[in-house]
Design a protein with these regions (language model features):
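N-terminal, active-site-proximal structural segment of metallo-dependent hydrolase catalytic domains
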Residues: 2-20, 26-115, 125-134, 140-145
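Metal-dependent phosphoester-hydrolase catalytic domains
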Residues: 3, 226-236, 243-342
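Short, surface-exposed beta-strand/loop micro-motifs that present aromatic residues
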Residues: 48, 175-182, 294, 329, ...
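Extracellular/periplasmic catalytic domains that process cell-envelope and extracellular macromolecules
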Residues: 50-54, 88-90, 112-115, 140-144, ...
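Active-site beta-strand/loop signature of hydrolases that rely on acidic residues for catalysis
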Residues: 57-63, 83-107, 151, 181, ...
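Surface-exposed cleft-lining segments at the edges of enzyme active sites
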Residues: 68-70, 161-170, 197-213
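Stable alpha-helical elements in mature extracytoplasmic
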Residues: 79-83, 105-109, 147, 160, ...
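Structured beta-strand-rich core segments of catalytic domains in phosphoester-bond hydrolases
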Residues: 94, 100-198
Length: 342
């Protein structure tokens, strides 16, 4: 099987390959009520903001569909089909996927889910085709795309991609950034950003990943500020933010991104679990568990009075792949668990 070369993700090289929350912070964060089963129930009080919308039902999922050119034996084609068919994948307003890197597998997943989600964006950084606008540091010569795409039950009125300038380690070689989509949700203009921030990577210098993530969140905030979106319209940010909910970087993440914390965080303790998840356990033995995936509302825009993020611990039917005459069996569809907000 492919060995874990670098942690969790794959930024653009230069033009060629050579070369605050309105000061919003959680007012009270209850310690996670952590049972032996790994379930959590964290409750957060949020500061006042326009409360005018019902919660949007959003699924965010890092699907670990790495390019088969680099990782040929991770069952990408099987997992793409199984993800689209999984019960947890059904019935949402919006789905945001990360690490949809493999072209064929990601295209197959989107196609298979098209009855449930008839509207979708292209994958960030794969090309400029299909977007209403491209901004940031997109480069057609970057080896890998950004892996983020958005699927929707509701019509997409506008779709833009933004490619981050800042990156380190393996992320430097991908067009990572964010998708910005404007949806018509029962007549309400709803803005959704899907993203995958800088991974913690041994190829980065000490402290650099957190610095890069802060710069990426600031770039996203500046982009959204420039849109002059009315405060009455909700703005959501969903994705693998690579910031541990249980860690010290979490308050800074909220402030840098102008994000309001969810009212509660429930379900499994960690969305990235190297002991409970069979793929994560194989790829990252002994590494710490982390809670990295979120659906959050912008702090100074309309948002629900109460909504939660639920880490959905899902194990699949076992599937087997072979490499160099040896078989490997897993019972998960990704090295992350999905997070559902609503």
């Amino acid at each position: 099987m492919p060995q874990p070369l670098i942690r969790r993700t794959s930024r653009p090289a230069a033009a060629a390959l050579t070369a605050a929350v309105l000061a919003v912070t959680p007012l009270a964060l209850a310690p996670a009520a952590q049972a032996a089963t790994g379930e959590t129930a964290a409750t957060v009080q949020t500061e006042g903001a326009p409360v005018t919308v019902a919660p949007l039902n959003v699924l965010t999922y890092n699907v670990f569909l790495m390019s088969k050119n680099l990782y040929p034996n991770w069952g990408q084609d099987h997992r793409a089909q199984a993800i689209a068919d999984a019960d947890f994948f059904q019935g949402h307003d919006v789905v945001v996927l990360q690490e949809a890197f493999d072209n064929a597998a990601s295209d197959a997943l989107v196609a298979r889910a098209s009855d449930e989600y008839p509207y979708h964006t292209p994958v960030v950084g794969r090309s400029t085709s299909g977007w209403d606008a491209t901004s940031g540091s997109y480069s057609s010569t970057t080896p890998e795309d950004g892996g983020v795409t958005l699927l929707s039950k509701w019509p997409i009125l506008r779709k833009e991609q933004y490619v981050f300038k800042d990156a380190c380690g393996a992320d430097w070689w991908s067009n990572k950034g964010f998708v910005y989509a404007v949806l018509d949700v029962n007549g309400v203009r709803t803005h959704v950003v899907g993203t995958h921030l800088q991974s913690t990577d041994s190829g980065c210098s000490s402290g650099q990943p957190a610095t890069v993530r802060a710069a990426q969140l600031t770039a996203m905030k500046t982009f959204l500020d420039g849109k002059r979106i009315p405060a009455s319209e909700p703005v959501l940010v969903a994705g693998d933010l690579n910031v541990d909910f249980h860690g010290s970087e979490y308050p800074s993440m909220l402030a840098d991104g102008n994000l309001a914390p969810a009212s509660s965080r429930t379900g499994w303790t960690n969305s990235f679990d190297t002991t409970d998840n069979s793929i994560a356990a194989y790829r990252y033995p002994g590494e710490p568990n982390e809670d990295l995936d979120y659906v959050l509302y912008r702090a100074d825009h309309a948002r629900p009075q109460s909504y939660g993020n639920d880490v959905h611990r899902f194990h699949s039917t076992p599937w087997t792949v072979s490499s160099w005459g040896k078989s490997y069996t897993y019972n998960d569809l990704s090295d992350h668990y999905p997070v559902i907000a609503g």
